[in-house]
Regions:
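Long, hydrophobic alpha-helical segments
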Residues: 61-78, 109-135, 139
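Transmembrane alpha-helical segments and their membrane-interface loop/helix boundaries
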Residues: 1-108
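Secretory targeting signals
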Residues: 92-123, 158-181
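Small-residue packing motifs within transmembrane alpha-helices
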Residues: 3-11, 110, 118, 125-127, ...
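Membrane-interfacial segments
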Residues: 25-33, 133-137, 177, 181
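Helix-loop-helix units of permease transmembrane domains in multi-pass membrane transporters
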Residues: 127-165
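Short hydrophobic alpha-helical membrane-anchoring segments
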Residues: 15-24, 128-132, 175, 179
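Hydrophobic alpha-helical transmembrane segments
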Residues: 52-67, 102-115, 138-150, 173-180
Length: 181
């Protein structure tokens, strides 16, 4: 069916582009955090010899490390912040939330491999599965298959196997990204 090929092609393109963009974003964020952490380490060590308590009051920024799998699903990283200011006798909140800098749509919808696998692929499978059965019924093929002795369960299992293969093909870019990371 042409719809299966279309959904497979679009799904693979979307999943591959999401994986590539997420990997590039992860690399950029790691580089920026490493540079900021290095600068902060230099500032901390450059404060000279002090009483340790006074040095603790001087404060230091610490940066949350990014795990490798954050390329596939960053989680709440964009909403909770990336760094925190540590100082003695005071508890500070996380700072520098990337979602606060983005546009409204960017706060809610970020194209990640996780979004493709958790939302878009299942929706495509539901629509394709419905379309498969509806098209067979409208063309009169379902009764013809039943007259040839094919049980309805076997027909449904065959359609389910096609959809499962399609879902696995759509998950392939994310699985390759996990293997490469």
């Amino acid at each position: 069916d042409w719809r299966v090929a279309l959904v497979l092609a679009l799904g693979l393109a979307l999943a591959a582009s999401a994986a590539l963009l997420a990997a590039l974003d992860l690399d950029r964020a790691r580089t920026a955090r490493a540079a900021a952490a290095s600068a902060e380490q230099g500032r901390w060590t450059g404060q000279g010899s002090k009483n340790p308590h006074s040095a603790a009051h001087y404060g230091v920024y610490v940066f949350k490390p990014l795990p490798t799998l954050a390329a596939l699903d960053p989680g709440v990283e964009h909403y909770v912040g990336t760094s925190v200011w540590l100082e003695a006798h005071k508890q500070n909140d996380m700072a520098y939330r990337p979602a606060a800098d983005g546009a409204g749509a960017d706060r809610q919808f970020r194209l990640t491999p996780a979004l493709v696998l958790q939302v878009l692929a299942p929706a495509a499978m539901i629509f394709l599965g419905f379309g498969m059965f509806a098209a067979e019924r409208e063309r009169g093929m379902l009764p013809a298959l039943r007259l040839n002795g094919a049980p309805l369960g076997a027909i449904a299992a065959a359609r389910g196997a096609v959809l499962l293969c399609l879902a696995l093909a759509m998950a392939l870019p994310a699985l390759l990204a996990i293997a490469l990371l």
